[in-house]
Amino acid sequence: MSLEIVILAAGQGTRMRSALPKVLHPIAGKPMLGHVIDCARQLQPERIHVVIGHGADLVRERMAADDLNFVLQAEQLGTGHAVAQALPFLSAEQVLILYGDVPLIQLDTLQRLLAQVTPDQLSLLTVDMLDPTGYGRIVRDDQGAVQAIVEHKDATPAQRQIGEINTGILAVPGKRLADWLGRLSNDNAQGEYYLTDVIAMAVGDGLVVASAQPLDAMEVQGVNDRMQQAQLERHYQRLRAEELMRQGVTLLDPQRLDVRGEVSVGRDVLIDVNVVLEGRVVIEDDVRIGPNCVIRDSVLRRGAVIKANSHLEGAELGEGSDAGPFARLRPGSVLGARAHVGNFVELKNARLGEGSKAGHLSYLGDAELGANCNIGAGTITCNYDGANKFRTELGDDVFIGSNNSLVAPLKIGDGATTAAGSTITHEVPAKNLAFGRARQKNLENWKRPEKIRK
């Protein structure tokens, strides 16, 4: 059956106390609406319609994509009214309705929900709660068939004792939806057009109302304030941590890991506390990551070691290489096999060949180093003249003395050496020793200045 999806994302989110539309607040570094859209895409619908209202322009700008149709709800008159705004664009046999502030919904749950939809049967997602206060109750008859959904403010005392609640997520036969929405009334305590009223209409029309429940109740937890946002964040991170551990990762404290993207891991990986993984991160077998590291869009090859307090972005570490502590590898940084970058070393668009080392206190930008090079402490590649960037190229087995300034564009040949304290401005041929510093002078009988007495 053909499928279209409507995502309701028009709410203001006043309890968030924020200028940012609620659905753009993040879970794991991604807007809540982004999580819902990603899940919806896995169902391969013909189209996804996003109903927007408060902050509509910003939501459209942030989430724009070719497969999304944004529909404006100028006035927020209830969920039924919101879905009605998408009606002119709907033609599929099935329509699935989701919510932009329910970010943890899972594909398996939605597939089970949709499997129950036929031309004469709709399906809604429910969950049992110990404290259902504030939620719409699922009213069933003596045989257990769903009869209606009653919102909390409209419920009788007896109905408020019901623990099964409406999540708002439902799937309906597309040909029936327009008729039901056209019959909605706002004669209720909220003065709104409730989408949930279509359940009673469906029953009255002789349709069967099926139901499904998520395996994890947190899947359908919505976000109305920052506390709920934090709860979902921690729940999401716990799930990701458990997933990594099942794949062979040792987490020294699963509660102190943040995953904010797509992570691929090998076996026998060890991750210390307070590590943040962002974007697309590939971690191969036997990698070790120390505490307080941030790793974004990077590849860590087999046996690589990241020591404490290091920051990697757009970097690749070869087999058996290591970085840190306090190393910063910016986009385009590549360490060859067994290469080493030590404390307070920054790389940017720089490649270190196999076995090369930059032990400490150096900046290497727009540089290409061959194999088995040694970079002395305090070395800087001077790659920018105020207008353009230039490259520094070192051959194999180059030894750079401490406190060197390598002024690009510059080439240093295989086996060359530069003396400590040098400013190197011209090409150094292979196996040459280059000095680029003032000759030392010693002044005899030097007397230190004395303080002036007043």
Curated annotation (Swiss-Prot):
Catalytic activity annotated for this protein? alpha-D-glucosamine 1-phosphate + acetyl-CoA = N-acetyl-alpha-D-glucosamine 1-phosphate + CoA + H(+); N-acetyl-alpha-D-glucosamine 1-phosphate + UTP + H(+) = UDP-N-acetyl-alpha-D-glucosamine + diphosphate
Name of the top EC class for this enzyme: transferase
Q: Read off the SUPFAM superfamilies from this record.
A: Nucleotide-diphospho-sugar transferases (SSF53448), Trimeric LpxA-like enzymes (SSF51161)
Where, by residue number, is the active site? Answer: H360
Q: Which residues are involved in binding Mg(2+)? A: D101, N224
Q: Name one GO cellular component term.
A: cytoplasm
Q: Does the keyword Endoplasmic reticulum apply?
A: no
Q: Where does acetyl-CoA bind?
A: A377, N383, Y384, S402, A420, R437
The EC number(s) this enzyme carries: 2.7.7.23, 2.3.1.157
Identify the stretch(es) annotated as Pyrophosphorylase.
Answer: 1-226
Q: Where is region (N-acetyltransferase) located? A: 248-454
Q: Which InterPro entries match?
A: Bifunctional_GlmU (IPR005882), GlmU-like (IPR050065), GlmU_C_LbH (IPR038009), Hexapep (IPR001451), MobA-like_NTP_Trfase (IPR025877), Nucleotide-diphossugar_trans (IPR029044), Trimer_LpxA-like_sf (IPR011004)
Family matches, as CDD domains: GT2_GlmU_N_bac, LbH_GlmU_C
Q: In which pathway does it act?
A: Nucleotide-sugar biosynthesis; UDP-N-acetyl-alpha-D-glucosamine biosynthesis; N-acetyl-alpha-D-glucosamine 1-phosphate from alpha-D-glucosamine 6-phosphate (route II): step 2/2; Nucleotide-sugar biosynthesis; UDP-N-acetyl-alpha-D-glucosamine biosynthesis; UDP-N-acetyl-alpha-D-glucosamine from N-acetyl-alpha-D-glucosamine 1-phosphate: step 1/1; Bacterial outer membrane biogenesis; LPS lipid A biosynthesis
Under the heading NCBIfam families, the entry gives: glmU
Quaternary context: Homotrimer.
What is the stated purpose of this protein? Answer: Catalyzes the last two sequential reactions in the de novo biosynthetic pathway for UDP-N-acetylglucosamine (UDP-GlcNAc). The C-terminal domain catalyzes the transfer of acetyl group from acetyl coenzyme A to glucosamine-1-phosphate (GlcN-1-P) to produce N-acetylglucosamine-1-phosphate (GlcNAc-1-P), which is converted into UDP-GlcNAc by the transfer of uridine 5-monophosphate (from uridine 5-triphosphate), a reaction catalyzed by the N-terminal domain.
Mind telling me what this protein is named?
Bifunctional protein GlmU
- Gene encoding this polypeptide? glmU
